[in-house]
Amino acid sequence: MSTYLVGDVHGCLVELKALLAQVSFNPEQDTLWLTGDLVARGPDSLQVLRFVRSLGSAVRMVLGNHDLHLLAVYAGISRNKPKDRISDLLTAPDADELINWLRRQPILQVDDDLKLVMAHAGITPQWDLPTAQMCAREVEAILSSDSYPLFLDAMYGDMPNHWSPELSGLARLRFSTNVFTRMRYCFSGGQLDMLCKEPPSQAPSLLKPWFDLPSQVAGEYAIAFGHWASLEGKGTPENIYALDTGCCWGGELTMLRWDDKRYFTQSSLSSNTESSGDIAL
């Protein structure tokens, strides 16, 4: 029984299956953690959703910003852009079933036995773990409810960018969503910067990667995240694992076997080598 952590799949089904074949992944015995962004930009978003769903309880995933954007497009809130390559998913005969399954997936995973936390973008240094879990439950509750289109319509935006326990309503949900699915940089006081997408070597000096600020979570739990392909899986402190290595941009799909911290990679087999970026959620 092994636990495997895989970075952003982005519709790269062939690479995902090849990576799982490297370790003879067995869904009856092993567990697969996925950092989110299952869909968009790669060639096989529809088949990725079908495959991941078919693995049932062997999968522990979190939602990413592209997954949320798909939900918004399907709900008629956002526009379908050709570069996302999700048109076949939107018109698939099982689209309703897949979308309803997707919106009921977690936005945060915590395993107390493994001392492991996973979120697509990370955990703000302004939160301790109970606060992160509380905020995740709030987002998950609205996404799985009949009111989810109201949330999807309100989630786009960069403000508020500073945590306060007094935040409420849609503003609180937007902040939490930005932390879990969009965050890269913070100011020294912990405020989110939602504009800079450059690697740390090219970022303004006022900004720090969220993982370089003192963390209330990372002292006790390891944190695994995706989202930030330009990191190339490098430059994080001990106990923080960056797993998005840009497969859909022509890079690699990366897997970490948690049991022995061994990495496995699968080079991109797709012709899609656009410049890295993300939906401005």
From Swiss-Prot:
SUPFAM superfamilies: Metallo-dependent phosphatases (SSF56300). Pfam families: Metallophos (PF00149). GO terms for molecular function: bis(5'-nucleosyl)-tetraphosphatase (symmetrical) activity. Transmembrane segments: none annotated. InterPro entries: ApaH, Calcineurin-like_PHP_ApaH, Metallo-depent_PP-like. It is an enzyme of class 3 (hydrolase). It catalyses: P(1),P(4)-bis(5'-adenosyl) tetraphosphate + H2O = 2 ADP + 2 H(+). Keywords: Hydrolase. The keyword RNA-binding does not apply. Its EC number is 3.6.1.41. NCBIfam families: apaH (TIGR00668), PRK00166.1 (NF001204). Hydrolyzes diadenosine 5',5'''-P1,P4-tetraphosphate to yield ADP. Belongs to the Ap4A hydrolase family. This is Bis(5'-nucleosyl)-tetraphosphatase, symmetrical. It comes from Pectobacterium carotovorum subsp. carotovorum (strain PC1). The lineage of its organism: Bacteria, Pseudomonadati, Pseudomonadota, Gammaproteobacteria, Enterobacterales.
